[in-house]
Amino acid sequence: MTDYAKNIQAFYERDDYKALAGQPGATAVEASFKDLTYVPRKTKPLPGMMVGTMLQEFALQPAQPTALYLHIPFCNLRCSYCSFYRNPFEAEQVEEYVQALLAELDFLQQQGVFAKQRPEAVFFGGGTPSVLNPAQISALLNKIHSVAKLADDCEVTFESSIYDLSADKLDACIAGGVNRFSFGVQAFDTHLRRSLGRLNTKEEVTAKLEEVAAKGVKVIIDLIYGLNGQTQAMLLDDIRTALACGVSGMDLYKLQIMHKSPLGQAIAKGNIKYEYNDKMLAEMFVAADALLAEQGAKALSCCHWAMREDERSGYNTLVKSGANIITCGAACGGHMGMYNYMKTMDRSDYVKKATSGQYAVMGMGKHNENYLLLEKLSGQCDSGRFDFALLKQYSDADWESLFKPLLEQWELLDLLYAVDGKYYFTAKGKYYYRQMDRVLLTAAECALYGKPGLMEQAGQKMMGIMKNMK
């Protein structure tokens, strides 16, 4: 039997524990965390050729929470902060890719992937799915309905830019069962939008949001804070503008400066000076969180708010809770049962394999028996609330007691507070939730497996070259 309490002491005895757990910042709104890259332990890497085993085992599994993701890796425009831009829009290449998606959906059905699973969410992401024409949209939606029996209340989300979603595309989406549209607005201010590479004016954006909302479907938008030239007042005005447009939900993300993005490269070369520090960003987020609460929005996670009772952010919730994520397309990863996988990054390679009856996986891993426990723990952190009693079905450990030193420190830092054995994040805690999540998962794995050996530490370092987001 695992001695969790003994094992976790190795984490609390780390020389850098105090820095990892968080210390008071220079002001009340700040906290200081040492950077910690988290890489899951005990995941067994497997070659992509094992994909057949994964599909066979998954086809035999009983019904479980499941989502379906379709990746559309094309964009008409490139945003200045984006490092994921891969394929500019070319009609012939898009059609070729759509045919590959249709073939892949047929293949998954033939393999029995949908035999026992009823997807609770379908998500068209990208890239920009709205580059598809109406016929392509209809073909994909019809194919999904023909190969899979969706849950009765399945959430079907279609990501779109304001620029691309014409009336005929909107109608094709709704006719095919799309009931939720997600727009990467990022900012309403016209000048600020132009600096990001966005063409539409504030007036055009609000008109499109109102047009889609009038169809009776859910409208979700993303906003970014921390953009050069953006003030706190502008961010709060953006939130009020969104609410006036009748949006159903809203995501609020801190700008991530990616090294390979045009913005990241300009900052690295000294051509642009980034204006914000942690104090300013935290103040913006706390003010936004307060306004959303004042307006009656319900926080479903640390970065997503619902304005309608029926908005549940189903796909993201499934992703954060260890559900099966079946993916179609190139350059996307998912989970099936005890396996995770990554699809080929090369679009041409994907098209060739998908149209010849192959599931184009480039690499895989097999989870250990604690995978769901850790996913549920991370999902609770993402939601901004801990209820450790819910973890008992995955582990016999007393996680509240094991995490007590961390929880007490986070209460002192005003990151969370306890009510009847449950813990709720403050606005400050929501701002720092990513750092808290990495610390908590590292501590949990120490409790489960003990202190990592030198070889394991070296492997984690190699796998964690990419810096985690803050």
Per-segment meaning from a language model:
Residues M1, A330-K470:
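Charged, E/D/K/R/S-rich low-complexity terminal regions of large eukaryotic assembly subunits
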Residues M1-T66, A115, K451, G459-M469:
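Flexible, acidic/Gly-rich N-terminal and inter-domain linker regions that tether
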Residues L60, F89-Q111, R118-A397:
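C-terminal scaffold of the Radical SAM
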Residues P62-V98:
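Canonical Radical SAM [4Fe-4S] cluster-binding loop centered on the CxxxCxxC motif
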Residues P65-A67, D153-E155, D420:
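Short, solvent-exposed beta-strand edge segments and adjacent coil->beta transition regions
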Residues L68-L70, F183, F425:
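Short beta-strand motif preference
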Residues S83, Q109, D437:
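Short, flexible helix/strand-to-coil boundary loops that buttress conserved ligand/catalytic motifs
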Residues R86, G112, L440:
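Active-site catalytic pocket residues across diverse enzymes, especially alpha/beta-hydrolases
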